[in-house]
């Protein structure tokens, strides 16, 4: 009886254990299944491992039926947990770009890495998870986009601290080596001025007239109008008095030089003249000459008509010279001589001595003619001389008028040293008539050029504004003949020379200084050379 009751109690206990285990298993199974179902409704990702505890939202979002991309394996596929809990579900991780291949080992030190941009905090609660890109490759470029890595450069120098205005350096390439400071080159010596081009339009130049163009023709004449002694020529080449009426070069020298023909014009009557000098032109002028024959006779100078005779003799000499077979100038005889004369430039100056010496210096002409009729006679004589030059073959002829003669030192009024306006009026009257006659000749004679060259205006401007031309003294001559008066020419023994010849406009009582001649003829060449060289 006892044994059967014991057996029954054991059986019941086994039954209860079995039932208890079955119930426990059912409860555990139901509990686990319901929990997974509920979690999948509220959390679309696998239950385990849970990234971080999330509170259940009041309105669970509807899962997106589109297929979810599978994150590539690797450490970069897992989403990185933010520093703290957020009320929004974290978006799916974006596929990260593949890391670049490891660079080959190089003996050069690698540049320091650039600091990475800070992570941007997640946006506030999107209603739906962001859709991934349909094509995971290529990954979106981060901002700012780094420039492409340049080719490796061997052994760069380490990066220097940033300068105030740094240049952009590639992130993976070596910084460029700084250029060495250039060594300052020694200052070069000023190059010598290039030689002047040879003149090809004017083969020769011929000068006629008075002392403005005389380069020594009066030296062998029996005349008092000479300048072949000191102090004349004190600033000339080799400081030699050559018979030029100035302290150096005169107008004929500068005109020939600026035309590109020759540096110095020889006198035709110079006994030392060379045949080669004849081919480029000479001077026939004589100090004291004038258009009026009476003027040259009074000064015992070479009259203007005699200068034409010398010009004819010159043409014959040149013709004989070019016919010589052994001459270095292989010209074609007379035809080439005619071309030399026609292409050359003939320049005439006169009228000053006709007014100063013949009209205002003596009373004979003033008794016969008034100033108007006398200037007409002188202008007609100038036109006759030009016509005879044309007859000898000259086709390019320039005629220089008279300067303001009343303002030269020897003709100023003695007491106040002011200009003689009566003499200036006579100069202007003669110049106006000369200009009119030359204009008529240009229209009448074919294939010719007649140019009136105005020096009255140039010298008047130099007298009015001497500082603009670099002159200080315009009333007194540099070469004086006495304490209170200025003679026409410098004397050999009694003349006193000014300390600075370049600051004086006039050298003696009539003629300009070398610097004044240079200034005057520069203006003449600038204004009239393009007409004469046509």
UniProtKB/Swiss-Prot annotation:
Please name the PANTHER family in this protein's record.
ANTHER-SPECIFIC PROLINE-RICH PROTEIN APG, GDSL ESTERASE/LIPASE EXL3
Span of the signal peptide: 1-35
Instruction: Name the PROSITE patterns for this protein.
Output: LIPASE_GDSL_SER
Q: Which GO terms describe its biological process?
A: lipid metabolic process
What is the tissue specificity?
A: Found in sporophytic and gametophytic cell types in the anther, only in male fertile plants.
Q: Write out the catalytic residues in the record.
A: 211, 508, 511
- Record's keyword terms, sorted: Signal
Pfam families with a match to the protein in the record: Lipase_GDSL
Record protein name field: Anther-specific proline-rich protein APG
- Family, per entry: Belongs to the 'GDSL' lipolytic enzyme family.
Q: Which gene encodes it?
A: APG
Q: Which GO terms of the molecular function aspect are on file?
A: lipase activity
Is Signal set as a keyword in this record?
A: yes
Compositionally biased spans, kind Pro residues? 59-196
């Amino acid at each position: 009886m006892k044994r059967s009751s014991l057996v029954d109690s054991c059986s019941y206990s086994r039954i209860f254990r079995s039932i208890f285990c079955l119930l426990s298993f059912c409860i555990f199974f139901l509990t686990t299944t319901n929990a997974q179902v509920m979690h999948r409704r509220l959390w679309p990702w696998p239950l385990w491992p849970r990234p971080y505890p999330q509170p259940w939202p009041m309105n669970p979002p509807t899962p997106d039926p589109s297929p979810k991309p599978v994150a590539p394996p690797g450490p970069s596929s897992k989403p990185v947990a933010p520093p703290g809990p957020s009320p929004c579900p974290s978006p799916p991780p974006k596929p990260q770009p593949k890391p670049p291949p490891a660079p080959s080992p190089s003996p050069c030190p690698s540049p320091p890495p650039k600091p990475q941009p800070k992570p941007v905090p997640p946006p506030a609660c999107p209603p739906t998870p962001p859709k991934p890109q349909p094509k995971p490759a290529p990954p979106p470029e981060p901002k700012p986009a780094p420039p492409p890595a340049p080719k490796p450069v061997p052994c760069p120098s380490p990066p220097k601290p940033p300068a105030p205005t740094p240049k952009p350096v590639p992130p993976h390439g070596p910084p460029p080596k700084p250029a060495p400071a250039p060594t300052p080159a020694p200052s070069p010596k000023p190059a010598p001025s290039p030689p002047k081009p040879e003149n090809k339009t004017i083969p020769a130049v011929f000068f006629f007239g008075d002392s403005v163009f005389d380069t020594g023709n009066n030296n062998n004449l029996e005349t008092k109008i000479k300048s072949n002694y000191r102090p004349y020529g004190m600033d000339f080449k080799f400081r030699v008095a050559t018979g030029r009426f100035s302290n150096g070069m005169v107008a004929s020298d500068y005109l020939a030089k600026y035309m590109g023909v020759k540096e110095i014009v020889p006198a035709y009557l110079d006994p030392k003249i060379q045949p080669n000098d004849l081919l480029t032109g000479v001077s026939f002028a004589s100090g004291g000459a004038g258009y009026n024959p009476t003027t040259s006779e009074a000064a015992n100078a070479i009259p203007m008509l005699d200068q034409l005779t010398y010009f004819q003799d010159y043409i014959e000499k040149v013709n004989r010279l070019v016919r010589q077979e052994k001459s270095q100038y292989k010209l074609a005889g007379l035809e080439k001589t005619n071309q030399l004369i026609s292409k050359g430039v003939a320049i005439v100056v006169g009228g000053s001595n006709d007014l100063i010496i013949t009209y205002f210096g003596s009373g004979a002409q003033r008794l016969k003619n008034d100033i108007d009729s006398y200037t007409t006679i002188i202008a007609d004589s100038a036109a006759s001389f030009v016509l005879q030059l044309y007859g000898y073959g000259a086709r390019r002829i320039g005629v220089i008028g008279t300067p303001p003669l009343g303002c030269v030192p020897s003709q100023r009024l003695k007491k106040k040293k002011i200009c003689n306006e009566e003499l200036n009026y006579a100069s202007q009257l003669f110049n106006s008539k000369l200009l009119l006659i030359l204009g008529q000749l240009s229209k009448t004679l074919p294939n010719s050029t007649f140019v009136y060259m105005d020096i009255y205006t140039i010298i008047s401007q130099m007298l009015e504004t001497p500082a603009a031309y670099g002159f200080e003294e315009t009333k007194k001559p540099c070469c004086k003949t006495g304490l209170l008066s200025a003679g026409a020419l410098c004397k050999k023994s009694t003349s006193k020379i000014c300390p600075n010849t370049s600051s004086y406009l006039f050298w003696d009582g009539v003629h300009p200084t070398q610097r004044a001649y240079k200034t005057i003829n520069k203006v003449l060449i600038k204004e009239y050379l393009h007409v004469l060289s046509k």
